């Protein structure tokens, strides 16, 4: 039976979340459109000039994914809503799903991406966690927007391993027109090395949910394996695929992904090296924790949302340098770059942050001053 999802989800997720980070109260306010505001907290590090941060929308409720078409934003909230933001107006749209949305700590309505023909079809793709009599799982589905409500349509992929932690969840359509999904190991590290499991993988599928004929393993959605909890995915202008991945306490990773390769977890992590396994392009090792989530690419650099790092991190693919571009705004869940502008969402209402007034928020910042877009 279809479920109309409730905002009570936030109270449930706070009671079920991990205790390794400070928890804060949930936000039950309606989203609002903020007046332009220059935040002194959004700043560059390493002596760089401060960036002017504009707040686009406030009172978001555990936002997880940013989708955008023209001047319209669609923000997926983990409790099971889509917030539409357009021309200074907002609307929190309900989502009706075929399965009961899980309220576990890191589960819920996660990845969300608009179909290429969305203006005509009103179709989007979503990754969500659910619970039934057989257990907890993740699935990839289409959502159809009608009369301000998103309804589950086609089931593309089901029974992706799920648990209170390590659900992965990012969805993106690649330059090849295929749908990619990041999946976590569901707190069972062994499945990341199991070629028959959908957990701990980067998955690749056609937009109708079928398996592409050129996937690296016959009759398999698996594109790469040996991942712990990847939550970010992006492509450079030469179509190179990159992902961001949560490490075990530390040892977070930014990886360059190639079809069919093994990225090591749980055999190696961070700076460790072993034949037949790929070590990351960037990692803090065991000395720091980023908790990286959504990511995007711009001008030779990767921009990564950091939850524990409480920043937007920039990784220069040519020089190997890395720095904080934005900091001081708390946990950051997702980023999106378009026309030289970086958009990002805070995630301080997820039960692990310390929410300030009117959080969470959608922000905007110009990446370079040679463009006034």
Tell me what each language-model feature is.
Residues 2-10:
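Sec-dependent signal peptide recognition
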Residues 6, 45, 222:
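Residue-level marker of regulatory loop/turn positions in helix-turn-helix DNA-binding domains and
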Residues 13-16:
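C-terminal motif of bacterial Sec signal peptides marking the signal peptidase cleavage site
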Residues 22-35, 107-109, 119, 186-324, ...:
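Beta-propeller domain segments
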Residues 169-170, 333-335:
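Short, surface-exposed beta-strand/loop micro-motifs that present aromatic residues
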